[in-house]
Amino acid sequence: MSSRSLVAAAVVALSGCAITQDVTPSGLDQRAQELCLVRNSEVVQDGFHDVYERVLEKKGFKVRWLPDKSPITSCPLVGTYEVIYRWDLAIYLARADLRIYADGKEAGRAVYDSLSGGANMNKFIRTEPKLTELIDQLFPKLKAFLRMKPLAEIAA
């Protein structure tokens, strides 16, 4: 087999093991807003909702949970999410699709997808660091809440 054929075969094989992440930043720049999250009852992974809420609170949001299937016009700022966990030697976050709506219109979206990750070992990630990364990219103008507080307040 020629070297070109080997390279082509390697590219085809590796392209099937892709992990993708695509973020459209929200552009929101106000701190400490209330963010209403529409609970997705299909997400049953232990602790996911607590982790997602904690990550958003660290970003400065006051999180209020809305019932499953609430309209995106229920609050001025609404978040929805779809999350898939898979098992392959261990349970891991395989896909997360986070959407933010401002006044009923999509204002930002973050999608992490390792469903085509195949044998790629980078698919084995922990939920909190990945959600933190996605939220930081989704709200790039908002600094983490702890970093915004004066040192005297943090020490108290």
Regions found by a protein language model. Name each.
Residues 6-14, 56, 98-100, 131-138:
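Generic hydrophobic secondary-structure signal
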